[in-house]
């Protein structure tokens, strides 16, 4: 049942409707219109990885590649360099249950392991379908 629910969520393009012009998704996905909300890289990486994996496994058709590529490019554009170090910024530190205000005021980090792991997973999945 869970697999079918995940497929339906992606196939009905509900998540894709909230993809920003930049290609990434907001910390609170459905509130991109609020200036206090911000584009978050770890969730964006995981959404792109999920799209690519679903395409690779035949669960989604190739028309979804444009959304995956747009998300990938949005994340890549957001990266910075400090000397020889790649910086993955805009990563929410930790999670927890809270209201909207709680989520948009979560600490933001660079190179937090949640973000680095999600970035590596995204790159691996993208490499297999791009």
Model-found features: residue ranges?
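Short, surface-exposed loop/turn motifs that are enriched in glycine and acidic residues
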Residues: 4, 33-44
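CBM-like carbohydrate-recognition segments
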Residues: 39, 43, 48-130
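Single conserved hydrophobic/aromatic residue that forms the stacking wall/gate
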Residues: 1-10
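C-terminal ends of transmembrane alpha-helices
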Residues: 18-23
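Short linear capping/connector segments at secondary-structure termini
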Residues: 26-33
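Conserved ATP-utilizing enzyme core subdomain
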Residues: 14-16
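Conserved active-site loop region of the serine DD-peptidase/beta-lactamase
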Residues: 11-12, 70
């Amino acid at each position: 049942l869970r697999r079918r629910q995940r497929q339906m969520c992606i196939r009905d393009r509900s998540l894709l409707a909230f993809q920003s012009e930049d290609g990434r998704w907001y910390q609170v996905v459905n509130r991109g219109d609020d200036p206090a909300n911000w584009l978050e890289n770890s969730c964006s990486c995981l959404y792109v990885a999920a799209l690519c994996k679903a395409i690779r496994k035949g669960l989604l058709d190739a028309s979804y590649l444009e959304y995956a590529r747009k998300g990938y490019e949005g994340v890549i554009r957001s990266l910075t360099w400090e000397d020889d170090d790649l910086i993955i910024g805009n990563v929410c530190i930790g999670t927890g249950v809270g209201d909207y205000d709680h989520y948009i005021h979560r600490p933001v980090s660079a190179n937090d392991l949640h973000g680095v792991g999600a970035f590596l997973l995204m790159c691996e999945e993208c490499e297999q379908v791009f």
